Every structure is written in C-alpha cells, then in structure tokens.
C-alpha cells in the first residue's frame, strides 16, 4: 500500500453516521462526506491508505444545498458531496476511532 500523504486527509472530510448509513454498513459499505473536487480514484486511494482496507467500488453523489430565509434575507446552504465506499469481502472499518 502507498504511504499516507497530507492530501489524503483533505479528500475525506468525515464519516456520515445516520440511520441509513448504519443499515448499509451491513452490506460492507461506508458513507463519507468528501471534498467537492475529489474524484472516485482519489477517494478510493485515500480510504485504502488511511484505513488499510481494500476498496471494490466507489459511488458518489452531490446533495444540493437548500435555500433558506432568515429575517427577510435569502441564503443558500453549501452543496455536500458524499461517497459510498464498498469494501472487499471480510474487511471492515471502525469509523468511531477516527483517523
């Protein structure tokens, strides 16, 4: 495996721990919030290096930010890019320990 580099920590922002993410964890999948400019190759490399696991597939999606109003002013929340990472059979990651 490759060595850990500082840009790996820039690619993966945080794991998303929701009801849905705990359900897909049973299927050997982990959901991360990633940098908006990160591509699938960079996400795969970062997960493999940081967590020392092998990744079989990476799916990404961009959740558009909502428009919100506050005291007559209209603003917009930031977009969020998520990655659903599928691990190889028999591999797991304990995301509660952190990076």
UniProtKB/Swiss-Prot annotation:
SUPFAM superfamilies: Ribosomal proteins S24e, L23 and L15e. It holds the Pfam family Ribosomal_L23. GO terms for cellular component: ribonucleoprotein complex; ribosome. GO terms for biological process: translation. Keywords: Ribonucleoprotein, Ribosomal protein, RNA-binding, rRNA-binding. Signal peptide: none annotated. GO terms for molecular function: rRNA binding; structural constituent of ribosome. InterPro entries: Nucleotide-bd_a/b_plait_sf (IPR012677), Ribosomal_uL23-like (IPR013025), Ribosomal_uL23/eL15/eS24_sf (IPR012678). Belongs to the universal ribosomal protein uL23 family. HAMAP family: Ribosomal_uL23_B. Part of the 50S ribosomal subunit. Contacts protein L29, and trigger factor when it is bound to the ribosome. One of the early assembly proteins it binds 23S rRNA. One of the proteins that surrounds the polypeptide exit tunnel on the outside of the ribosome. Forms the main docking site for trigger factor binding to the ribosome. PANTHER family: 60S RIBOSOMAL PROTEIN L23A (PTHR11620). This is Large ribosomal subunit protein uL23. It comes from Hyphomonas neptunium (strain ATCC 15444). The lineage of its organism: Bacteria, Pseudomonadati, Pseudomonadota, Alphaproteobacteria, Hyphomonadales.
């Amino acid at each position: 495996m490759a060595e850990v580099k500082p840009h790996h920590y820039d690619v993966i922002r945080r794991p998303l721990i929701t009801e849905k993410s705990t359900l897909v964890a049973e299927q050997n999948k982990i959901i991360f919030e990633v940098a908006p400019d990160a591509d699938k190759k960079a996400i795969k490399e970062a997960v493999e290096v940081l967590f020392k696991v092998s990744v079989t597939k990476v799916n990404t999606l961009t959740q558009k930010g909502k428009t919100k109003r506050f005291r007559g002013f209209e603003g917009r929340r930031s977009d969020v890019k998520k990655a659903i990472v599928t691990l190889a059979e028999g591999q797991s990651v304990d995301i509660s320990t952190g990076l």
